Structures are given as C-alpha cells and as structure tokens.
From Swiss-Prot:
<dbReference type="GO" id="GO:0001561">
    <property type="term" value="P:fatty acid alpha-oxidation"/>
</dbReference>
<keyword id="KW-0209">Deafness</keyword>
<feature type="binding site">
    <location>
        <position position="264"/>
    </location>
    <ligand>
        <name>Fe cation</name>
    </ligand>
</feature>
<dbReference type="GO" id="GO:0019606">
    <property type="term" value="P:2-oxobutyrate catabolic process"/>
</dbReference>
<dbReference type="GO" id="GO:0006720">
    <property type="term" value="P:isoprenoid metabolic process"/>
</dbReference>
<comment type="pathway">
    <text>Lipid metabolism; fatty acid metabolism.</text>
</comment>
<keyword id="KW-0898">Cataract</keyword>
<dbReference type="GO" id="GO:0097731">
    <property type="term" value="C:9+0 non-motile cilium"/>
</dbReference>
<feature type="binding site">
    <location>
        <position position="193"/>
    </location>
    <ligand>
        <name>2-oxoglutarate</name>
    </ligand>
</feature>
<dbReference type="GO" id="GO:0048244">
    <property type="term" value="F:phytanoyl-CoA dioxygenase activity"/>
</dbReference>
<dbReference type="InterPro" id="IPR008775">
    <property type="entry name" value="Phytyl_CoA_dOase-like"/>
</dbReference>
<feature type="modified residue" description="N6-succinyllysine">
    <location>
        <position position="252"/>
    </location>
</feature>
<feature type="binding site">
    <location>
        <position position="266"/>
    </location>
    <ligand>
        <name>2-oxoglutarate</name>
    </ligand>
</feature>
<feature type="binding site">
    <location>
        <begin position="175"/>
        <end position="177"/>
    </location>
    <ligand>
        <name>2-oxoglutarate</name>
    </ligand>
</feature>
<dbReference type="GO" id="GO:0005782">
    <property type="term" value="C:peroxisomal matrix"/>
</dbReference>
<feature type="binding site">
    <location>
        <position position="120"/>
    </location>
    <ligand>
        <name>2-oxoglutarate</name>
    </ligand>
</feature>
<feature type="binding site">
    <location>
        <position position="157"/>
    </location>
    <ligand>
        <name>2-oxoglutarate</name>
    </ligand>
</feature>
Length: 338
C-alpha cells in the first residue's frame, strides 16, 4: 500500500508538468591485477547458489566485485536500443519521467534535438523499448545470481559519452554507486552494464578497483576539476591513489556485473565518436529503504530532492524514498518490499 501511495504522489506531480559456454564467460582486464588467491570456498557472501555461475566465476566475483560476461546481449537488441535513443534525441518520443542530461561544457544556446547534445538518458522505466533491456532473459539469468529470484529494476541509464572537449569533462570520477541508493543490503544489489559498441581506454572504458566492494561506503562530493563537473558526478573524496586499477576493454554485447560498493569510474573519450552503453541497477525486492539523514549520503539526497522540487514544485511533498519507489519496477518474481 505504501508503494502505491508513493507512486500515486509522483504520478500526480508528473501530471502537473540462453547460457554461454564456459569459455565465453570470463573477465578481460587490460591493466592492473586481479586475484582469487585469498578466497575461501566455504564463504560465499556476494553470490547465491544456483546453476548459472561456475565455481571459478563465483570466486572471481567474490574476490574482485565484478564479472564480465562476453557477448551476452544480441546485436539485434542493441540496435533497437540505439534506434530508440536516437528517437529520444530527436524528440520523436518523450517517455514519462525520463531525465535527459547534457555535458557541462554545452551551453544552452547550443541545445538542439541531436544525439551530439545528449550525454545520457536515465529513468527510462516508462520507455517500453529501452526498458526491454531490464527484462532480457540473458540479463536476468545472471542478475538472479546476486539478488535472488525477486528482482526489482531500480535505476536505468543509457550513456552516450561524448568526445572530450579538451576540458576533460567526459571523465566520470571514481565513485561507488551505493552513494546514490537509499536501500540495503548492498550485497543484494548489482549493476548490469552492457557495451553497445567496442569500448577501450581510447573512448573511455570503465575502470575498476578490484576488491574494493569489501570495504565501506566512502564520503562523496563533486571533485574540484578545473574544466567543470557534470551534474550528479560525485566522486570519492578519499581513496588509495596507488591501488591497482583494471580497465575493462569490452566488445558490443559484453556485459559487466558489479557490486554497488565497487569503486569505479571512466576516463576521457579521446575519439570523435560517441561511446554508448546501457545499464540497469537491480536489487532484491526483499531489500529495504533506509533514512540517509545524518550519513555521508545526505548531500546526494538534498540534491536529488532539490531537483525534484525544481521540476515539480516545492509544494509537492516528495522525499528520496518516494522518488526511488516511483522509479522501481518489478521484473521477476514478487514485489515483497521495495
């Protein structure tokens, strides 16, 4: 009933305005080191028992906090997602609740209905075509290894990393996704992130710090970059700069699953093309919401709620939990809590 009331409140506000072979399922780091040497077989904390992951895959995720599945999403699906994104850019479709983001270096006078103007769309839960990504059997089969059978799609994004303007604003600072999430436990949350084309260090691939998912949530804020920082691009304020990093070179359809405490980011896009990826954060429907007031997450709560009030009016009483309950969609099993 509480979920329905929260969703109804935001609806009113908005109204106002197939398993791969074992050889194909591997991680492909291109820098840094990874390890499973310290893993103790009797201790599985981050993966659940089923017949999808091999023992080696479970060990890898347990130790490193991420796992790359090669060639998981078919080309045909990726092309459909690309086509829908282009329609959104041309304003041919306007899904309810969608957030469209542009690079901080693009002035308002330059805005035009073009793929070149949009760096990311998120919250596409009302776009049937893009949201298909969150329901693909190929994706959910692996998601269930981390969340269990009752699965909620919590946060959706299609990222269109632009060529860097020279100010390095196409970078994404090192961060932990849990900073943005007012729900727990973290071990029952996972991100699926799929490359929509060849992704390398040249066009700004993901970089991860293996094993950092075993730590705690660190304080985040905007980094002090001379060229500016994009909206919501919070970064960790305190981390080991010399810690080993792994750059994930991926091909179209490759998908990385990673823990929300894993420290990760991405570099500049040094090419003239737009680097595309589509992703969804999934959580067990058995997770619960928390109050982030008085914690390191309070700054992102104030920012998100402030943006909601800006768009929907401060007279509408919307809190962070309402916003997340409105975004959340059941994709498998039963909606037991979230």
């Amino acid at each position: 009933m509480e979920q329905l009331r929260a969703a109804a409140r935001l609806q009113i506000v908005l109204g106002h305005l197939g398993r791969p072979s074992a050889g194909a399922v591997v991680a492909h780091p291109t820098s840094g080191t990874i390890s499973s040497a310290s893993f103790h077989p009797q201790q599985f904390q981050y993966t659940l028992d089923n017949n999808v992951l091999t023992l080696e895959q479970r060990k890898f995720y347990e130790e490193n906090g991420f796992l790359v599945i090669k060639n998981l999403v078919p080309d045909a699906d990726i092309q459909r997602f690309r086509n829908e994104f282009e329609k959104i850019c041309r304003k041919e479709v306007k899904p309810l609740g969608l957030t469209v983001m542009r690079d901080v270096t693009i002035s308002k006078s330059e805005y035009a209905p073009s793929e070149k103007m949009i760096t990311k769309v998120q919250d596409f839960q009302e776009d049937k075509e893009l949201f298909r990504y969150c329901t693909l059997p190929e994706i959910l089969k692996y998601v269930e290894c981390f969340t269990g059978p009752n699965i909620m799609a919590m946060h959706t994004m299609l990222i269109n990393k632009p060529p860097d303007s020279g100010k390095k604003t196409s970078r994404h600072p090192l961060h932990q996704d849990l900073h943005y999430f007012p729900f727990r436990p973290s071990d029952l949350i996972v991100c699926a992130w799929t490359a929509m084309e060849h992704i390398s260090r040249n066009n700004g691939c993901l970089v991860v710090l293996p094993g950092t998912h075993k730590g705690s949530l660190k304080p985040h804020d905007y980094p002090k970059w001379e060229g500016g920082v994009n909206k919501m691009f919070h970064g960790i304020q305190d981390y080991e700069e010399n810690k080993a990093r792994v750059h994930l070179v991926m091909e179209k359809g490759d998908t990385v699953f990673f823990h929300p405490l894993l420290i990760h980011g991405s570099g500049q896009n040094k090419t003239q093309g737009f680097r595309k990826a589509i992703s969804c954060h999934f959580a067990s429907a058995d997770c619960h919401y928390i109050d982030v007031k008085g914690t390191s997450q309070e700054n992102i709560e104030k920012e998100v709620v402030g943006i909601a009030h800006k768009f929907f009016g401060a007279e509408n009483s919307v809190n962070l939990k309402d916003i997340w309950m409105f975004r959340a969609r059941l994709v498998k099993g039963e909606r037991t809590n979230l």
